[in-house]
Amino acid sequence: SKLMLAAVVLAGALSACALKQNSFLLATPDQPKDQAGHQAKPGWATQGFSVAAANPLATAAGYQVLKAGGSAIDAAIAVQMVLTLVEPQSSGIGGGAFVLHHDGKKVEAYDGREVAPSAATDKLFLDAQGKPLPFMEGVLSGLSVGVPGTLSVLETAHKEHGKLPWATLIQPAIQLAEQGFKLSPRLHQALLAENDLINDAVAASYFYDAQRKPHPVGYVLKNPELAAVLRDIADRGSLALKQGAVAQALVQKVRQHPTKPGSMTLQDLAQYKVIKREPLCFDHVVQTTGKGFQICGFPPPSSGALAIGQILGILNNTPAGKMPLQQGLPDSDWLHFYT
């Protein structure tokens, strides 16, 4: 069914100016290429703003929002909505997200990670004999689907830092879903490596041809079912995934898994709460110049900022911090301390 396709996509995977729905004219830039081996990338520096995303279509959507007078949060919302469509193997509104926001004065951390359903216990991934399930058996089941938080966290951040109307920010993704987008090499490779998605009839009809092979790179995928979901999101915000037909389809998909059904309920969806956390910040001084920085990132349950702080803290207790760069690059001795 139409809603079930949207549920497959969701279960599988952070005021001033009003714009008309057709104000976003989306060109199709080059799609991301396959990452095979080392590639040299130029450095980029900007003075006004920049947008970085995993797919150029998403980057373009964020750029257009900023040009229209939107805030960084506005742009991030447009980016995430497009990624839900064009990068379903990696990112989507059916999962969770961290949002780290800095306005030049204050750093804020919004935790929108997915959470376990209320009925989950510490035996969730154990078999009848009390032994751990094989990893992929647990992943490819209703057991591994958490209560999604991405829409809620983006909505919360938008209420505090958004400039453009919420519905405006969903329009680029709606247009691409209806008009179609070219299947990228990255998505194509992910489908080639995937052995189980083909067994879902709804997903198979979308991603694969009649010979059960992934559609080729450049094939135009249209997703009117997801466009309908996005229109509901434009109208109702995060409630679109908490109450109503889409929420019911999502719960049904999880609870009716043929071998390992999950326990997620409509009440789990409705009760999801975003958590405002204290950012993890630490001071770092470049010993060769004496210049100091405050580096901030997301606190646990994220691990990136914590790991960076540990790495820099360890380096500061070695000679590495005082070693000058050679033509802007560290030498082999520095790399020895780093590794």
Locate each region found by the language model.
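Bacterial N-terminal signal peptides
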Residues: A6-A13
